[in-house]
Amino acid sequence: MKKALVNTRVSVKLRKSEYRDEWYLYVESYPVFQSGKDTPQRVREYLNRTITTPIWDKSRNARTNADGKTTYKPKRDLNGIIQCKSQLDQESCIYADKVRSLRQKEYDNAALYADTDAE
């Protein structure tokens, strides 16, 4: 009998700094099923990298506040890497995407080989 796949998806996201005009890069995984917990968990791994020059995609709204202010999602290239104006920030985003790729491969392999180890 076939087991349903978990389909854990790993993505790179931004979090606004509270005190400065910069954004923290982090890798988010969802859904992650952990032992002892009934509901799927959202796992965040912060990369200790910040960027200050993301390019915002004005055609993709993230949310609109009660006072009418709209925030936007970052612009991404064809590979899903966040676009930045400065070269240093762009390298940080490429690094974050490499980490995302590694984590995605780990979750995919864990899902594939979980059945073979149990037998």
Task: List the predicted regions and their residue ranges.
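Basic/aromatic DNA-contact patch characteristic of tyrosine site-specific recombinases
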Residues: M1-E119
